[in-house]
Regions:
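Conserved AMP-binding/adenylation subdomain of ANL enzymes
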Residues: 1-16, 23-126, 165
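Conserved AMP-binding/adenylate-forming
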Residues: 120-168
Length: 168
């Protein structure tokens, strides 16, 4: 627990977590113990196949997950965007580029982004990403630890670009 307390200092008793992995999974068990020690409210989903329906109801601030969960979120977002009109697809792809520049090139490195990137992110990309995150129940997320297998760089970068803080 000590290592979690050092690395995850922003977790407080005001946070909520969603548990959907089996408790036999060591990652879920360790994460839940950490949450209990911090006083974090844990919602237990007994139907993992329905996680996409339940997430918007719970809207956790923290949640441990295996890469497969994020692969499914990524696929669902891409399916939705690819089924949208061409104009919306173009806007979303442009917004992802802006999000990557702002969140990965600058923000993650502790730098301020150029004015044009910052404004494009604030007024166009971020509101669009907020809608995506809200639909997935990830709009309250502070951070989401991932372990158990390798998460593809493309998915990790996409999630960071839209403002989902995956700790990997």
């Amino acid at each position: 627990m000590r290592i979690h307390n050092i690395r995850l200092t922003s977790a407080t008793d005001k946070d909520t977590s969603m548990a959907f992995l089996p408790l036999t999974h060591v990652f879920e068990r360790a994460w839940d113990m950490f949450c209990l020690q911090k006083g974090i409210r844990i919602y237990v989903n007994k139907r993992p196949a329905e996680i996409a329906k339940i997430m918007p109801e719970v809207r956790p601030t923290l949640m441990c997950a295996v890469p497969r969960y994020w692969e499914k979120v990524y696929a669902a977002v891409n399916d939705k965007i690819n089924g949208s009109p061409k104009l919306l697809q173009s806007i979303f792809k442009w917004a992802i580029k802006v999000g990557r520049r702002r969140n990965l090139d600058y923000y993650r490195n502790g730098k301020l982004s150029p004015l044009n990137v910052g404004l494009a992110y604030k007024f166009i990309a971020k509101p669009l990403f907020n809608k995506v995150k809200k639909a997935a129940g990830l709009d309250n997320g502070n951070f989401f630890p991932v372990a158990g297998a390798r998460l593809a760089d493309e998915i990790l970068e996409f999630m960071h670009a839209i403002g989902i803080n995956i700790v990997y």
